[in-house]
Amino acid sequence: MRSKTAIIPCLNFYILWSSYLSDSDGKSNHTDMMDDYSASAKALVAEMQAKAALSPTKAVAFQGAPGCNSNIAIQDLFPDSLPLPCFSFADALTAVKEGRAGRAMIPIENSLNGRVADMHFLLPESGLTIQAEYFLPINHCLVAPKGAGKITHVLSHPQALGQCRHWLQAHNIRALAHADTAGAAAEVADRKQTGLAALSPALAAKLYGLEILEKGIADGDTNITRFVVLAEADTNLQDLPPIRQNLSGKMMTSLLFTVKNTPSALLNAIKGFGDNQVNMTKLESYQHGASFSATQFYADVEGEPSEDKVARALDILHEN
């Protein structure tokens, strides 16, 4: 059974989620979001949204246009699901909260370009719990309409642009930010502008009728994005599409905590994890407020809050 730990406020820290690892504010006006998609993507988005509306529990929400990496991750992990495109990360999370989707597939970090912006507050604010994580190998393609000529500008999500920045600099191509990779491909297909290309998955090029000019242009040989699968804490998992991969036996807990910017404050706060043999696999800092008097940290630890050793470590964190 997967843990369904909800957000638990405990003075200076929050337990956000506990989940097994996989082996590998009001109603949103989501219908108006259709205008944010390029013309080439609108028909596909409308079709996918209509199918998801007929069977919301089978729907898995994602940010972006059809053909983006989140869409691919859903196809890999939930082959029997109904992908539900949403224009923003907040929209995807809201779709789950409003019952328009049973789950959401959200990227949180990349091996080349680090964490995905805003996830450290969007996820805990959503109140959803992590069911699983999924690691997707990323293959960025330079795509453009036939006859685009010499490419001088490229459109894509900032994460994709960051993962390919050295390649783009070496080829004297200027980067332009877009809401997502597949959406960039759709816009390039609509514009048919000389010299303009997109960075996107090959699937997006196929969907929007673009040529693949280059493949595998990331700045590292291994480019992997970590996704998390989120759902409501009280979700009946038997009602949702099954996860393709078997779950491993390892439980992970993610948490946020805040410490004052004083000597040894962080050391004292996390000392309990080491003392109780709890492995911390991730620790990131975020500035807390405008006073710069405290820092917020995001951490992943092995185990679940109900385990004695994890509970003891959390008690020490709580005390500090």
Could you tell me what each predicted segment is?
Residues A6-N320:
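Domain-level signature for soluble enzymes in the chorismate/prephenate branch of the shikimate pathway
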